[in-house]
């Protein structure tokens, strides 16, 4: 068993049991965004979170160390994502990445937005022309240091 196998078991149980990510997050005691990332193999659960996920999804005991293992973050099966939804984010960064960089540097100076000290909130935004996806991202600004 490896982390990919555990992710497959989680997805299979989620589908067959009709579990929503928000339900998992409530059981784990974290946001739905962080919990979903952890279930999909991008974050590591603490012991209590791993136990809650194992119980909810009916995972075997050998899944626990994989749920708690620090993952290789940002790993996708291909360099350019093929999934249409994920590709839109890739496209968004390709088009607006330099704009994000310019505006962040103008506002904060030379540095980066942390993806470690980070929060995200995803909501449905009703719109008469078709519902919209609203994603709010908040990352700590980390200035580059001179030495």
UniProtKB/Swiss-Prot annotation:
GO molecular function: cyanate hydratase activity; DNA binding
UniProt entry tagged with the keyword Protein biosynthesis: no
CDD domains on file: Cyanase_C
Gene3D superfamilies from the UniProt entry: Cyanate lyase, C-terminal domain (3.30.1160.10), lambda repressor-like DNA-binding domains (1.10.260.40)
Keywords (A to Z) from UniProt: Lyase
Enzyme Commission number(s) of this protein: 4.2.1.104
Enzyme class per UniProt: lyase
Any Gene Ontology biological process: cyanate metabolic process
Annotated catalytic residues: 88, 91, 114
Catalytic activity: cyanate + hydrogencarbonate + 3 H(+) = NH4(+) + 2 CO2
Family: Belongs to the cyanase family.
Protein name: Cyanate hydratase
Source lineage: Bacteria, Pseudomonadati, Pseudomonadota, Betaproteobacteria, Burkholderiales
């Amino acid at each position: 068993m490896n982390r990919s196998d555990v992710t497959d078991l989680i997805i299979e149980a989620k589908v067959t049991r009709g579990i929503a990510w928000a339900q998992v997050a409530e059981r784990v005691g974290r946001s739905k965004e962080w919990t979903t990332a952890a279930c999909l193999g991008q974050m590591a659960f603490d012991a209590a979170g791993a136990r809650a996920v194992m119980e909810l999804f009916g995972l075997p005991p050998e899944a626990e160390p994989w749920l708690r293992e620090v993952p290789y973050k940002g790993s996708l099966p291909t360099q350019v994502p093929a999934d249409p939804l994920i590709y839109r984010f890739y496209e968004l960064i390709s088009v607006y990445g330099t704009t994000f960089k310019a505006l962040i540097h103008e506002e904060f100076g030379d540095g980066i937005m942390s993806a470690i000290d980070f929060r995200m909130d995803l909501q449905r935004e009703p719109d008469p022309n078709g519902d919209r996806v609203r994603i709010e991202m908040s990352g700590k600004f980390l200035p580059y240091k001179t030495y």
